[in-house]
Amino acid sequence: MYSGPGVKTSPDFPIPETMKAWVLGNAGELKPANKPVPVPKRAEVLVRIDAVAICATDLEIIYHGPPASIAGGMPFNKNFTPGHEYMGTVVALGPGVDEYRIGQRVTVEIHAGCGQCKRCREGMYTSCHNYGLNYGDVDKGHRANGFTTDGGFCEYQVNNINTLVAIPDAMSDEEATLVVTAGTAMYGLTELGGLVAGESVVVTGPGPIGLLGVAVAKALGAQPVILTGTRDNRLKIGRELGADHVVNVRNENAVEAVRRLNGGKGVDYVLECSGAANAVNEAIRMVNRGGKVCLAAFPHEEVMVDVPHIVRNNIYLYGIRGEG
């Protein structure tokens, strides 16, 4: 019988002792496995996973390893379960947990910082100094499900209560898996960027973060919101999510198009989500003097950046890691 010291369960949500899971073998290899259902400890709950999204970072981990770090090294052949964009139902409460109730639908953030380092105390838990280290003890240190600890490619997972977001009944399971993806864009534009309603935003790259960045920018009152990309079907979705203008960079010069659409002076913000090698140099030419460029993606190779242009035009360039 599934149980643990001080753990609360309900007969309405029976929990097995073992579950099906995917584990990472060699690079590029996921294998089915049976694992014990984890038991929540203090400040944790057990989530029955109802839906999972697949992020491009999951594929990076599966095929290359980083940014996952298991036991201080590569994640291969360590019985590690990836996956970090998931939602589900709370089915067990760890000792003393009363912030959530059994049966409640939640979506999850990735990171539960160590809570002790300088960055965590500042609220920047995705920049936790103990990422992947955990002081040698996962109970004391940083957790990043799907990165430093088991993730969501399984039937059940334990999450710290600080990583949970309650979701309304009107939101579908599939939509809920993308809440934290939207949070990544929001973190870059508001918490770090300071976006004010009426300011102009360009989003480059209509992947999941980029498309949700369009929706977030529009909801926050940005005007206009311009989306650039290479695929008309993705640009069409961007229109549906609120983009005032879309630019297919295969058909026209992105910088020229953005400046034309914004009266020639450049925009206030660029949210760079493409990871293209030339993206930074294009972005710094899309923004107005004193504008801000937020990097939510990056190329795999080193790139040359026009630093003199950044300095002469007082452009702010910053990166974001995850949702907070």
Regions found by a protein language model. Give the residues of each.
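NAD(P)H dinucleotide-binding glycine-rich loop of Rossmann-like/cofactor-binding domains
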Residues: 37, 73-75, 99, 114-204
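Residues in the short beta-alpha loop(s) of Rossmann-like NAD(P)-binding domains
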Residues: 230-231, 299, 323
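Mid-domain Rossmann-like dinucleotide-binding core that forms the NAD(H)/NADP(H) cofactor-binding site
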Residues: 105, 162-164, 168-252, 256
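Glycine-rich cofactor phosphate-binding loops and adjacent beta1-alpha1 units
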Residues: 193-197, 220, 236-316
